[in-house]
């Protein structure tokens, strides 16, 4: 099982799309290399931070409303379909990114997975 876990980590680090996981409170717990390329933050800078790190201030209330609803229902409104949205780069520059969201159910709690480009 440990070997499969290591393989999964290597795959996530090498895919071309940004992959970000956040726990139930919105704290970033997984940040791959493509996330660094897209948003400018290293994994060390992003891990442990709120996902607000990459969400423009004017979109945060809507984000948290959708996030809380998804965590309560165990499913996202878009059901994994990609959507075009705004995000923030480390430099402060606003980006248009295509994102999709999924709830990943674990043994004890669920996490939110973002995939973006």
Question: Each PLM stretch: what is its role?
Answer:
Residues 33-46:
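PAS/PAS-like sensory domain cap-loop motif
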Residues 45-65:
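PAS-family sensory/regulatory domains
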Residues 16-17, 82-83, 100:
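Short loop/turn microsegments at loop-to-beta-strand junctions
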Residues 76, 83-92, 102:
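PAS-family sensory domains
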Residues 2-25, 30-36, 79:
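Sensory modules in modular signal-transduction proteins
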Residues 99-114:
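Short loop/turn elements at sensory-signaling interfaces that couple input to output
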């Amino acid at each position: 099982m440990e070997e499969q876990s290591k393989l999964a980590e290597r795959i996530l680090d090498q895919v071309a799309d940004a992959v970000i996981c956040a726990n139930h409170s919105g704290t970033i717990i997984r940040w791959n290399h493509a996330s660094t390329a897209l948003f400018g933050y290293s994994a060390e800078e992003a891990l442990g931070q709120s996902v607000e790190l990459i969400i423009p201030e004017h979109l945060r209330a809507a984000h948290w409303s959708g996030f809380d609803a998804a965590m309560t229902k165990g499913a996202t409104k878009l059901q994994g379909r990609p959507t075009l949205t705004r995000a923030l780069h480390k430099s402060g520059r606003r980006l248009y990114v295509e994102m999709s969201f999924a709830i990943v159910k674990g043994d004890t709690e669920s996490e939110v997975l973002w995939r973006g480009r």
